[in-house]
């Protein structure tokens, strides 16, 4: 069995690319031949790399980026040249370039379509892409979703439920920077630390997370890691609300710094407000470190499925700052409650969201094609 992961770009920028890469490395480590074909978003990444005897990374030249799609004719022609080399092509959606490459190639083998999310923001692009997207859905032998919630909620998949299967995303447990975490605990000594991580963009709902600090006393501090276009307005919100001592924007964090903040925090918050966030990988990273999660009940999203309500944490309505604050208090102001959520968050991670479990389930899906 020889597999090709097809989609997005390299180096890794987000969750879809990470899943592709983890599947390639995980499957090849299990003895399954698995390559990856993608567009390079940096010139120095163009080329082919043999990662091990069963895994090759092929990054093709691209000449422009439109919305979240790299335009790469080279990817199309490469797919056409190698179309007979693979038993299964595992294409990751949303990525119109990957879909176009598959269509152009004339590939005749089995197709696994990994439906990470609907196209929500780029509505004009969707109008152009819709016929090709419909072709891809019909062409797929199996459609893989990251949560049962998203598979059922997507309007594009309502007529093909008989060929859908759930494959939850899995990650390796965080290797916490213990010294870094201890230093942060000392820096915020006596504080209940709430951590959040992601790009500073509207759908992350950070303005509501910041506003929740108005409902908390001075024993709380909210730390938000990541950069993005909303940095200035969010800083202005913090200053105008007089929350400088309660809310900190940390900016870009290195991988080591991220693990230190995960280790130091008492609780992780995912305040997203739109179904653009379909899963929330950061939640399972937090769970792997034994941290309870407060997340939002976004209609049609798998976020609140990942964070089991009153098991690994608490889910609240989106855009409700007071509800976020109340959830923080309920978890952090009762030691028994906190310990129970912490233990259950860890158990949920090890039961459902490890990288090993994702790879094992993926192999089962392939074998059933």
Language-model-detected regions and their locations in the chain:
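Conserved donor-binding/catalytic core segment of Leloir-type glycosyltransferases
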Residues: 4, 183-214, 223
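Donor nucleotide-sugar binding/catalytic pocket of nucleotide-sugar-dependent glycosyltransferases
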Residues: 38, 133-179, 249
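Short His-centered aromatic/hydrophobic patch
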Residues: 91-98
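Short alpha-helical donor nucleotide-sugar binding micro-motif in glycosyltransferases
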Residues: 137, 252-253, 260-265
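Nucleotide-activated donor-binding/catalytic signature segment of Leloir-type glycosyltransferases, i.e.
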Residues: 233-253
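Acidic donor-binding loop of glycosyltransferase active sites
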Residues: 263-278, 291
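Short hydrophobic beta-strand element within catalytic cores of glycosyltransferases
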Residues: 288, 292-297
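Conserved acidic donor-binding segment of nucleotide-sugar-dependent glycosyltransferases
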Residues: 308-321, 329-335
């Amino acid at each position: 069995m020889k597999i090709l992961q097809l989609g997005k770009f390299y180096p890794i920028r987000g969750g879809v690319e990470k899943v592709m890469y983890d599947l390639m490395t995980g499957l090849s480590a299990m003895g399954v031949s698995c390559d990856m074909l993608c567009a390079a978003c940096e010139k120095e990444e163009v080329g082919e790399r043999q990662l091990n005897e069963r895994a090759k990374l092929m990054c093709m030249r691209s000449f422009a980026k439109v919305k979240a799609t790299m335009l790469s004719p080279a990817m199309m022609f490469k797919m056409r040249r190698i179309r007979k080399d693979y038993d299964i092509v595992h294409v990751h959606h949303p990525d119109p370039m990957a879909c176009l490459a598959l269509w152009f190639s004339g590939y005749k083998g089995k197709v696994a379509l990994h439906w990470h999310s609907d196209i929500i923001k780029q509505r004009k692009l969707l109008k152009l892409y819709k016929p090709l997207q419909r072709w891809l859905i019909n062409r797929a032998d199996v459609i893989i979703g990251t949560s049962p919630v998203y598979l059922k909620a997507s309007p594009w998949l309502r007529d093909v439920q008989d060929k859908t299967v759930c494959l939850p995303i899995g990650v390796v447990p965080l290797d916490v920077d213990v010294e870094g975490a201890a230093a942060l605990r000392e820096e915020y000594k006596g504080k209940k630390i709430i951590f959040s991580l992601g790009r500073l963009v509207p759908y992350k709902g950070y303005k509501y997370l910041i506003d929740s600090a108005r409902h908390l006393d001075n024993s709380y501090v909210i730390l938000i890691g990541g950069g993005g276009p909303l940095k200035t307005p969010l800083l202005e919100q913090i200053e105008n609300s007089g929350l400088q001592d309660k809310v900190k924007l940390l900016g870009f964090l290195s991988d080591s710094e991220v693990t230190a903040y995960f280790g130091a925090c008492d609780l992780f918050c995912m305040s997203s407000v739109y179904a653009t966030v379909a899963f929330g990988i950061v939640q399972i990273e937090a769970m792997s470190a034994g941290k309870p999660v407060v997340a939002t009940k976004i209609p049609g999203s798998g976020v609140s499925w990942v964070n089991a309500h009153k098991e690994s944490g608490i889910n609240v309505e989106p855009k409700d700052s007071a509800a976020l604050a109340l959830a923080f208090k309920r978890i952090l102001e009762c030691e028994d409650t906190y310990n129970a959520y912490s233990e259950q968050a860890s158990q949920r991670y090890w039961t459902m969201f490890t990288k090993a479990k994702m790879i094992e389930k993926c192999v089962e899906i392939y074998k059933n094609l």
